Amino acid sequence: MKIAYLDGIRFFRVLYAGFQSLLDEQDYLNKINVFPVPDGDTGTNMAFTLMGIIEHIQPHSRLDLNELSDIVADAALDNARGNSGVILAQFFQGLSMGLKPYAEVSTSQFADASKIAVDESYTALMNPVEGTILSVLRAWSDSLLAASNTSPDFQKVWKISLEAATTALNYTPEQLKVLKDAGVVDAAGRGFVSILEGVMNFMNTGDIRKLPKIDTGFSAVALESTEINADNLSFPFCTECIIVGEDIPRDKLSQTMKPLGNSIVIAGSKHRAKVHIHTDDPANLFETLAIYGEVKQQKVDDMREQNKSVRSQQKIALVVDSTCDLPPDILEKHHIHVVPVRLNFGKEQYIDRVTITNDEFYSKLAHSAHHPQTSQPPPADFKRMYQFLSSHYESVISLHLPQVLSGTYQNASAALEKVKFKKHQTIIDSLSLSGGTGVIALELAQAIDQDMRFPELVQLADDTIEKTEIFIALKTLDAVQKSGRLSVRKKRLIDFLGLNLVLNITREGYLKPCGVTFGRNNIFNKFEKFVLKKAKSKSIKRVGIVHGVNPEPAEKLRVVFESAYPDAEVFVSDFCPALGVHAGVGAIGIALQFN
């Protein structure tokens, strides 16, 4: 049956079929991802981008073609992730430009629009490289243009252009040595061909649900050869944001970004631009880009950690949020994956421990006119993390702040419901925070290293939570009062009486006072005695000491607890900035894990 035109309804179905085909193949795309960085997330990034489009177009299946293509372009820009996702976003921007005059199109009109889309894709990159998705896009579009001159049938034209795209894909190893050495084709190019195959299948069958299993054509040996080390990257942070402004000059924007990193991709319009870059200083990047407009939807991934996940032999991933306080070397050693909390000073937005350091945070806390606010990681951040990990691990345990204190647990749970690991997945309420969550996470991480089975790990988590307590002493009550958790009247009374509150987490997960010490002198010596008295003669396995830029008392406490409990494992860590919002400068916490 001849298909003579493409309208909004058909375009909706075509997109759905094509996107579903790629979603089915995202794990494979992650495995063959070696360029520009072997961080194993091309499939995840393309899938995340396309899922965002699908969610946005669901209510709009009966719009005219030009109206629907505008919605697709906007959704692609908002949801683009990674180098490949931002290139796709600019492709859909260009396609929308080409389809703007039409409620429906012929093969030749669609081919003309595809050329604009491909041209726009090239403009997104400062240094376009052949042997990538760009080569596949160009071959597909050129073939569409040629075939549409001789046939008005979309089915016939699509078949010819798919063959051209596949040929270009198979040639990518000849264009990029890194692909040839790894024995793979370009991952993003393969993703685009997968979309085309899904569309072709839909045209042939008329049924979106009948998607064939795609033969990748590569052996397991080839997949193993993609495990390239990325520990020594000059620009290790894959960094993205959206800039909203009045008249964003893309040429000037790209020149501004050029000294700050590589793999620069810019998509969007004069009023809304999505930028992608690999950099060594995300905070400096966001601050620099603010001259062009409001910087929104900040995202930063450490590609070194992603690469370690690709190479990891572990079968179970452990995820925490950034309120879990552990020293960086412990997080790295045990491959603990961190989803950062967000915080802001007025309109200035930051990613906890990524785009703001502890020193920077406490400096702003002292001098900013705005008291900072925190917000839990959005479900999209968790979803992207889980999607990536599901390609490299069989199971996941995600450990988070108490449900009664934050929406972090709920957001993680909502995201995990949309991602399926091969074997097991669960969200655990730590019923603790900071160093308390840290000692629980460390217990689980060490058990994962020893190949403990998933059911036993869940039981171990429950047992460790039951045996963990955290005590927190505040140097001042200023931050807790400014954050709205203590009234001005109560603060004045406590200060007048010379009381020092000691806080802990109840068995239900609430943060409440559990005692006081008296007198403003030697606060932390008194706190030390308070905690030792609480511990009494109990056997302690692990101690986590955390502080808000107050290292000297923290170090003294480390010596005290190592002496009092010589068999215990003791670590010292900073309070994360997100907790510093409420605890303030100088706060000290002591987490105890009992045997």
Describe each model-derived feature in a short phrase.
Residues V319-P377, D381:
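N-terminal glycine-rich anion-binding loop in soluble enzyme alpha/beta folds
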